[in-house]
A protein has these predicted regions:
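Charged, alpha-helix-forming regions
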Residues: 1-93, 98-101, 105-173
Length: 173
């Protein structure tokens, strides 16, 4: 897989079939009715039963609407994936206006994969793959892939852009 910063977003290319399958599964993970996923995405926030009930009645529905709205944007971008040419494979364009939706959705998908595969922090340690079932090992790889996309979207990955000494000098004044 490769990625680049475009004028109006981020372009991810040469996506493998596994990457495409993972990405296409993201909306389904967010929409899961599995109680473990719902509990992870909307955890208990108050020890007091009355406060928790109030939060569930008033705040949780709004968060659910946000999940739905973000998932709609992500699904729209996924439906627009195309093969540009034979060598570049499938490409995904994430417009700047959708980056926040993608970040939130990717994070939620990672949380869902974690709980659906009954994982613990130990699965992500240096020797964690030794304790993983094959299904958990696959989930670890998918979680790392989604985290890598988040890193790109957060700007934590060098895009190979050369520094402009004039801009850098002006910024330091």
């Amino acid at each position: 897989m490769w990625f680049m910063r475009a004028a109006d977003g981020y372009l991810f290319g040469a996506l493998t079939p596994s990457c495409i399958e993972t990405l296409r599964g993201v909306p389904m993970l967010i929409e899961s009715e599995d109680e473990r996923v719902r509990a992870r995405l909307l955890p208990e926030t108050y020890e007091d039963h009355e406060s928790e009930a109030h939060w569930r009645a008033h705040a949780a529905p709004e968060l659910e609407r946000l999940f739905v709205a973000r998932t709609v944007l992500v699904r729209k971008d996924l439906m627009a994936m195309r093969q540009l040419d034979f060598d570049s494979g499938i490409v995904l364009m994430i417009p700047d206006s959708h980056v926040n939706a993608w970040l939130a959705t990717l994070n939620a998908a990672r949380l869902a994969l974690f709980v659906l595969n009954e994982m613990t922090a130990a699965h992500f340690e240096r020797k964690g793959l030794k304790i993983c079932t094959p299904k958990q090992a696959e989930a670890v790889a998918r979680i790392h892939f989604l985290a890598g996309m988040q890193e790109v979207l957060l700007g934590a990955v060098d895009h190979g852009e050369e520094e402009d000494p004039l801009t850098d000098a002006a910024a330091s004044e």
